[in-house]
């Protein structure tokens, strides 16, 4: 009997991989003539008409995600060079605002949840955000429904919205500059300047906020000690701004600035897929630079610093860019009792190290080397719409510290236009 395959689903056994002596891929070929050489990403172009759960299941027990989640758009126009979602979900497709109002009403009515969260990769870029948020406030605020807006840029509009939907005394502002210095922010194409951060903070402090969370990554390509030291310096400037902006009698205690750093892991389908990683010791040394920098600041009493475990980062790096050889090690870890390893209390790095050793896998091969531009990657047979040529250009732009504009400012020819919809065709009527 013959079996049918759904178009563009990947069946590993139908492809054969050969390797060079150095362990990199020599070829990746289908074993039958009628098997496609590349797998094309399938995409829903009309997000408004796509099925969305109007009656999400509500569990008997209290769940962590105890709220209605409303997706307002898919994709992101920003093009941060470290971000996989921003590349994989191109092009941006918005949902119609009237449809979203209707969905919000139906979902809140059917679940009885007391919170609605607007979900997207960058909510501030949703073109009808103001109308949607004002509708939700007018319609549901009086009924005891909280409105949560993750991934907002901090500006006058979002602060105005947040002051309407949050308890200012309890809530904090979140910025994700990702890198401490402007130079490194240009390398990663994160279009957030110090001016924007300080201006947003000042407006927030004037509005009564006094808690700020800052998120950064350590170990980004081209990072220097100067870039690391810029992280506590930025936090100190924000703290100084609070004490300059808010007169003593109006202060709600001292300001609290929390810096959190994670260690950067290069991901497939991003401009940084060629980047090298570091050893756990090197990562922790970077965190130490930041920690010492925090203690050296004038306002160090207002600054708190959290950092990640480094061995989890290295493991994530192996899994993120691993090939099919890693599969056997995964099975071994499971056989050794590794099941809830994403929970720190169950995580045992030794178990992973043993599994890799037993399979004869040199993990440094996946983490410690910068890839050649012409290397064939284990995921190259998947066509996500964004071309490898575009990613190469962006990898070069990163090293040249050149910023690429977002999709609404200017098309950079990433390849996603071939899907025939979304942001690529927004203003082409």
Which residues does each predicted region cover?
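Short, small-residue-biased leader/transition segments that mark boundaries at the very start
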Residues: 1-6
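N-terminal [4Fe-4S]-dependent radical SAM core
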Residues: 12, 18-69, 385-397, 426-429
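Glycine- and acidic
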Residues: 65-69, 81-91, 113-121, 180-187, ...
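N-terminal pre-triad scaffold of radical SAM enzymes
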Residues: 56-84, 108, 149-150, 171-172, ...
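Flexible glycine/acidic-rich beta-alpha junction loops that bind and position SAM and/or redox cofactors
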Residues: 16-20, 127, 157-161, 183-188, ...
């Amino acid at each position: 009997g013959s079996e049918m395959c759904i178009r563009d689903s990947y069946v590993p056994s139908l492809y054969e991989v050969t390797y060079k002596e150095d362990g990199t891929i020599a070829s990746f070929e289908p074993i039958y003539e009628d098997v496609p050489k590349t797998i094309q990403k399938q995409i829903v172009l009309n997000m408004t008409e796509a099925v969305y759960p109007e009656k999400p299941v509500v569990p008997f027990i209290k769940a962590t995600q105890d709220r209605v989640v409303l997706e307002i758009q898919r994709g992101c126009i920003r093009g941060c060079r470290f971000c996989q979602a921003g590349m994989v979900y191109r092009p941006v497709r918005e949902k119609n605002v009237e449809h979203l109002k209707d969905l919000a009403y139906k979902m809140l009515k059917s679940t009885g949840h007391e919170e609605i969260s607007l979900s997207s990769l960058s909510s501030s870029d949703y073109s009808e955000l103001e109308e949607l948020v004002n509708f939700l406030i007018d319609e549901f605020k009086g009924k005891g429904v909280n409105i949560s807006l993750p991934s907002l840029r901090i500006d006058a509009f979002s602060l105005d919205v947040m002051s309407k939907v949050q308890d200012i005394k309890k809530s904090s502002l979140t910025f994700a500059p990702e890198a401490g210095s402007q130079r490194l922010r240009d390398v990663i194409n994160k279009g957030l300047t110090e001016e924007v951060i300080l201006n947003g903070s000042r407006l927030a402090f004037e509005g009564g906020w006094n808690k700020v969370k800052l998120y950064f990554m350590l170990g980004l390509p081209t990072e220097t000690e100067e870039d690391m030291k810029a992280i506590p310096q930025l936090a100190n400037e924000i703290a100084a701004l609070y004490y300059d902006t808010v007169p003593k009698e109006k202060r709600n205690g001292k300001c609290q600035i929390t810096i959190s750093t994670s260690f950067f892991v290069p991901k497939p389908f991003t401009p940084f897929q060629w980047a090298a990683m570091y050893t756990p010791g090197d990562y922790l040394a970077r965190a130490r630079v930041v920690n010492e920098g925090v203690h050296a600041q004038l306002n160090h009493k207002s600054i708190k610093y959290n950092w990640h475990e480094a061995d989890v980062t290295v493991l994530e790096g192996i899994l993120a860019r691993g090939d099919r050889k890693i599969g056997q090690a995964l099975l071994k870890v499971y056989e050794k009792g590794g099941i809830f390893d994403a929970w720190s209390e169950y995580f045992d790095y030794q178990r992973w190290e043993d599994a890799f050793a037993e399979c004869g896998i040199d993990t440094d091969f996946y983490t410690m080397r910068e890839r050649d531009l012409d290397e064939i990657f284990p995921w190259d047979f998947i066509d996500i719409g964004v071309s490898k040529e575009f990613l190469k250009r962006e990898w070069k732009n990163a090293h040249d510290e050149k910023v690429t504009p977002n999709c609404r400012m200017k098309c950079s020819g990433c390849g996603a236009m071939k899907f025939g919809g979304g942001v690529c065709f927004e203003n082409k009527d």
